[in-house]
Regions:
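Register position in tetratricopeptide repeats
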Residues: 50, 91, 125-126
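Canonical positions in the second alpha-helix
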Residues: 71, 104-105
């Protein structure tokens, strides 16, 4: 009788525990893409930049850029990726390459708001105001 009781208790507890673990979130949902990770780094970098912590911002931009390059290799010619590639490259001081990424993105989507805005900022910083007005 005692054996049956403990066996029943054990089976009941196993079933209860099993049902809870089956419903728990194991974190096996969709993984973030390199692009998504890069956007997170860019957003983090912008916050550090706003606070004046330029060294941390630079490191985040560098991490974002590496992920964006990888993303662009895997899925080439996506305007959003090219926009962020231009942005991170510009933020890291390479205006010429940043401009190339922006122009490549505009060739695909001439009305891309982000690219047009950031390219305008690049033109202002590089003292080409006439191009920024376009």
């Amino acid at each position: 009788m005692i054996k049956k009781f403990f066996l029943s208790l054990f089976i009941t507890l196993s079933l209860i525990t099993g049902s809870y673990s089956a419903s728990s979130d194991t974190g096996n949902g969709p993984k973030k893409t390199d692009y998504d990770k890069a956007v997170s780094f860019v957003n983090s970098a912008k916050k550090f930049e706003k606070k004046g912590n330029l060294e941390k911002a630079k490191k985040r931009y560098e991490k974002a850029q590496k992920l964006l390059i990888k993303s662009n290799e895997n899925k080439p010619n996506k305007p959003n990726t090219l926009n962020y590639l231009g942005f991170t490259t510009r933020k890291l001081g390479d205006f010429e390459l940043g401009e190339k990424y922006y122009l490549q993105g505009l060739a695909i989507d001439p009305n891309h708001v982000g690219i047009n805005e950031y390219l305008g900022e690049l033109y202002v910083v590089t003292k080409r105001h006439n191009l920024a007005i376009e």
